[in-house]
Amino acid sequence: MIFNSQFFIFSFLQNLDRQLLLAINRAYSPALDAVMVFASNRIVWFPVYALLIGWLIYYFRRRALLLLPLVIGAVALADTITSRLFKPYFGRLRPCHDTGVNALLHLPDGCGGQFGFLSSHASNSFALAVFLLIALPAGRLRSLKIVVLCWAALLSYSRVYLGAHYPSDVLGGAIVGGLLGWGAATIFNYHSQPAVPYS
């Protein structure tokens, strides 16, 4: 009885995951295709990351010597855990490689690697976003915090839109990345006073 209940719940969640994927993926247009392909391309964000690192060094000054290793470490660890641990261990095919669903998908950006659980894009972006939300001083830089959080959400959404991940891949990746970002920011705040802008 317990086994049957667990199987029913698993089947329900799996079906829900697939239906959400199809609903998001099928709500496409040429304009959205361009936006999502752009958002999902890691290379185009490198200049933004460079500017962000430069700004963090300017804003935190000496404390950046602690902040940068922590935030870079959180993102790198998020990427390693999702890419080298979860994906090969669980071996869950990306939707675009899954013969049970890929014929129904709109794939404007082709298909990436074979496995998709968990999403590295989601884990990396939320590790960075959550770190900044916590490490930046409370009550300040609200616009930046909102932009960073929206960026992480858009990047994660784009992975489902493009058929590269199931929603659960993205949700799980966001949780892992968020926890790592929270942990790194907590360490930073413990060893550093809240940032005060230099005049």
Per-region residue spans from a language model:
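Alpha-helical membrane-inserting segments
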Residues: 52, 77, 81-86, 180-188
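Alpha-helical transmembrane segments of multi-pass integral membrane proteins
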Residues: 37-41, 70-71, 173
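Interfacial segments of alpha-helical transmembrane regions
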Residues: 53-82, 145
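Short, aromatic-rich membrane-interface segments at the entry and exit
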Residues: 42-46, 64-69, 142-145, 167-168
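N-terminal transmembrane-helix/juxtamembrane module of multi-pass inner/ER membrane proteins
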Residues: 1-49, 82-113
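Membrane-embedded catalytic cores of phosphoryl/pyrophosphoryl-handling enzymes
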Residues: 106-199
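Hydrophobic alpha-helical transmembrane segments
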Residues: 40-60, 121-132
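Membrane-interface elements of multi-pass transporters and channels
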Residues: 27, 31, 59, 63, ...
